[in-house]
Structure formats: structure tokens, C-alpha cells
Amino acid sequence: MKILLILACAIACTCGERYCAMKDDTGLSCRNGTASDCESCFNRGDLIWHLANWNFSWSIILIIFITVLQYGRPQFSWFVYGIKMLIMWLLWPIVLALTIFNAYSEYQVSRYVMFGFSIAGAIVTFVLWIMYFVRSIQLYRRTKSWWSFNPETNAILCVSALGRSYVLPLEGVPTGVTLTLLSGNLYAEGFKIAGGMTIDNLPKYVMVALPSRTIVYTLVGKKLKASSATGWAYYVKSKAGDYSTEARTDNLSEQEKLLHMV
């Protein structure tokens, strides 16, 4: 918003007679007394007129946008987080549609330089959109989790316990993974991922899935109190490869489960 205001002031200083500051109360004449009227200024898409009449609306929109970006996290509000994800998913097709429409408009008026920039923007947007789907499908192939299609998810922590696979989206690959057991509830990265757990249910290894590979973390240390089902377990990287993260319920040893390939 500040950048737009600075740009508007610069335009007004250099060629102020060409822009309407605001519509007069008595009609369409400009307050700055120019020969042109505000209707013609608005039809030409002048920035000063738009900001003077719509600055409050844009302020509200930007406040909502900032709130969604800052507090759109699961630990704050799932509702705001859902709105944030919806916005991020819709941005790709909206930007693609705008660049294609702008390319068509520029071609109609023979502005071929801007037409070329619009085509380049459309191609870049389309390629980035395809890359998002490719990486998401690769990650889903390993985890079978819908978190794979979260635009913010770069990796997924997978914990197999009680015959099930529990997942948690991550922004990056951790150096080590700590699982905390509090009164039978299992926590990872501060989030509760499972309940009804006991010390014996803690896995010997956990995995972090990436689109290109799966990293295996092996248990190296733990401190547990059996009477209250409370404690912690720490895992470090041991190997990486094309491993599946799905929980196996058949009669396989831990090593055979680990070597199960996608």
C-alpha cells in the first residue's frame, strides 16, 4: 500500500494536471480545476482517482490478507488456515487467467512488447503450477497423505505405531526428530499426533518423506517413565532411499518393513 501511495505521489508531481484528485460534490468536475472531468480520468484507469475513492476498502482487504497470512496456521485457527490454503490454491489459476487475458488485450492494440511479457508470465506461472502438482503427487505416492497437496508442505513426518501411520507436515528436513509422550499422548514438533500410546508402542524408527526420497531416522536415545506413560525419544538420520512410509500390518520384521520399497 505504501509503495502504491509513493508511486501515485510521484505521478501526481510530474504530471498532476492529467489526474483527478477526487470527484467534486456538485458533479463530475475535478477538485483541482483541470479541464477534463473525473469520469474520463476514471475510464482511463488513473491511479490517483482509484486510491482517493477506494483506499478504505483496500485497507480492509489488506488487513484481512495480512491477518490470514500471519495467523493462518493450524495452532491458531483451522478456519483461518483453511482460508489461507484456499487463497494459495486459487492464486495459480487466477494469475494464469490474468496473464492470458492481458496478453490478448495487448495483442489487440498491437503492443507486442507487453504481449511478450504477458506470454512469458503465463508460461512461468503454468510451469510453476505443474511443478507444484508433480511434487505433490510424488509426495502423496510416498505417504498417501492429503497433506502432500498443501502448498506450504516441503516434507512430511511419518510415524508408524499401533498398526497405523501418523503424519505431520513439515517446512523442511529436521536434523533430528523428538517424540514426546505425555500421559499416553504422543507429540511431535509440539503437535499431538496420537493418543492411547504406551512406552512399548514407541517406534524404533520414524521417517521424513520428501518428493525425491524418504529419510529414515533411527532411535538413539530415550527417557521414559512407565508408571505415567511419560517421556521422550530421540531419532537421528540413518539412511535415505526410495522407501514407503505406509504402516505395514502383515508379519514382517522391522528390517523387512524398512526395506519395503515404493
Swiss-Prot record:
GO terms for molecular function: structural constituent of virion. GO terms for cellular component: host cell Golgi membrane; membrane; viral envelope; virion membrane. Residues 18-47, 99-112 are virion surface. The keyword Transmembrane applies. Residues 69-77, 134-262 are intravirion. Keywords: Glycoprotein, Host Golgi apparatus, Host membrane, Membrane, Transmembrane, Transmembrane helix, Viral envelope protein, Viral matrix protein, Virion. It is found in: Virion membrane; Host Golgi apparatus membrane. PROSITE patterns: COV_M. The chain crosses the membrane at residues 48-68, 78-98, 113-133. Pfam families: CoV_M. It comes from the Viruses. Its main location: virion. Residues 237-252 are annotated as: Interaction with N protein. It is a multi-pass membrane protein. Component of the viral envelope that plays a central role in virus morphogenesis and assembly via its interactions with other viral proteins. Homomultimer. Interacts with envelope E protein in the budding compartment of the host cell, which is located between endoplasmic reticulum and the Golgi complex. Forms a complex with HE and S proteins. Interacts with nucleocapsid N protein. This interaction probably participates in RNA packaging into the virus. Belongs to the alphacoronaviruses M protein family. This is Membrane protein. The gene is M.
